[in-house]
């Protein structure tokens, strides 16, 4: 599928992510239409998915999505809780229309109901749990892209992306890879490293999120641990002293410029005269 182009080839970094998210781990049973995507079978009976075929089908699906003129006509659906967060994130970055949760029956076939929609392309997390939208899409000739495990039925599925669609991390990673390739084909991002992390597409347990929120609320605030002390503002007017600062600063310079003038400040003659006058006055006061 990459056409021997290095820019479209499967990178080692992506393979590492897939292995860490157990994308290659299938189930113990195999659908006869999924046998071509199985690499081997482990001794414990679990089938291993060929990641090379996974990447080829992922690029094919990304090309189909990027070819849609209006991104809002692409519908991403996941009734499984593990894929709802990934679907919402995928729709946010690719401008698709998400359906996270229960699918309203007749949304593609019943024109009377308010929830009626006419998408041009449908993407589902699991064709087994999302069988209702897949079946309705077959009635109105809507092509379907599905993330399929080794035991997933491929009835009414046009493009099957083989992967582990039962692991929360695998589901989030596959939606992240699909969103990245779509944005690359549209020219919105380069083929360098994408700034968005796959962690944003992973499922988060609501109970754990509530516990984290409760822990943040229960933790004392910083202002409670360190109460603020009243700030005393000194309103003394220092304008007079500031005006005298230049004269004080200039005094040492004047002293250094004229060191010979210092001895003149002390006049020994004046002292002698004072002492003489004082002695004379004492003598006159004695009456001798």
From Swiss-Prot:
Q: Which InterPro entries match?
A: Ribosomal_uS2, Ribosomal_uS2_C, Ribosomal_uS2_CS, Ribosomal_uS2_euk, Ribosomal_uS2_euk/arc, Ribosomal_uS2_flav_dom_sf
Provide the GO biological process annotations.
Answer: ribosomal small subunit assembly; translation
GO CC, alphabetical: cytosolic small ribosomal subunit
| Keyword vocabulary terms for this entry | Cytoplasm, Ribonucleoprotein, Ribosomal protein
Q: What GO molecular-function term can you cite, just one?
A: structural constituent of ribosome
Presence of the UniProt keyword Flavoprotein in the record: no
Q: Which Pfam families match?
A: 40S_SA_C, Ribosomal_S2
Q: Where in the cell is it found?
A: Cytoplasm
Oligomeric and partner information = Component of the small ribosomal subunit. Mature ribosomes consist of a small (40S) and a large (60S) subunit. The 40S subunit contains about 33 different proteins and 1 molecule of RNA (18S). The 60S subunit contains about 49 different proteins and 3 molecules of RNA (28S, 5.8S and 5S). Interacts with ribosomal protein S21.
Explain the purpose of this protein.
Answer: Required for the assembly and/or stability of the 40S ribosomal subunit. Required for the processing of the 20S rRNA-precursor to mature 18S rRNA in a late step of the maturation of 40S ribosomal subunits.
Q: Family, per the entry?
A: Belongs to the universal ribosomal protein uS2 family.
Q: What is this protein called?
A: Small ribosomal subunit protein uS2
Source species taxonomy: Eukaryota, Metazoa, Ecdysozoa, Arthropoda, Hexapoda
């Amino acid at each position: 599928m990459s056409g021997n182009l290095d820019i479209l080839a499967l990178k080692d970094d992506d393979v590492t992510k897939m292995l860490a998210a157990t994308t290659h781990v299938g189930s113990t049973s195999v659908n006869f239409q999924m046998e071509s995507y199985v690499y081997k079978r482990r001794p414990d009976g679990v089938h291993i998915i060929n990641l090379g075929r996974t990447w080829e089908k992922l690029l094919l699906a990304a090309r189909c999505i990027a070819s849609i003129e209006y991104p809002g006509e692409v519908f991403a659906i996941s009734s499984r809780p593990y894929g709802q967060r990934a679907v919402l994130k995928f729709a946010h970055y690719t401008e698709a229309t998400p359906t996270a949760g229960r699918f309203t029956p007749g949304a593609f076939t019943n024109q009377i109901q308010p929830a009626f929609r006419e998408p041009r392309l449908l993407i589902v997390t699991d064709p087994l749990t999302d069988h209702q939208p897949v079946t309705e899409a077959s009635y109105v000739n809507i092509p379907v892209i599905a993330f399929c495990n080794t035991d997933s039925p491929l009835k009414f599925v046009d493009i099957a992306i083989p992967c582990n669609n039962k692991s929360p991390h695998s589901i989030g990673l596959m939606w992240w890879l699909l969103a990245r390739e779509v944005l690359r084909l549209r020219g919105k991002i380069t083929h360098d490293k994408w700034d968005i992390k796959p962690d944003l597409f992973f499922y988060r347990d609501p109970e754990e999120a509530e516990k984290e929120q409760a822990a943040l609320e229960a933790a004392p605030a910083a202002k409670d641990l360190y109460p603020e002390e009243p700030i005393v503002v000194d309103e003394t007017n220092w304008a007079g002293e500031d005006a005298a600062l230049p004269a004080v600063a200039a005094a040492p310079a004047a002293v250094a410029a004229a060191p010979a003038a210092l001895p003149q400040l002390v006049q020994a003659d004046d002292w002698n005269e004072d002492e003489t006058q004082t002695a004379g006055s004492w003598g006159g006061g004695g009456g001798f």
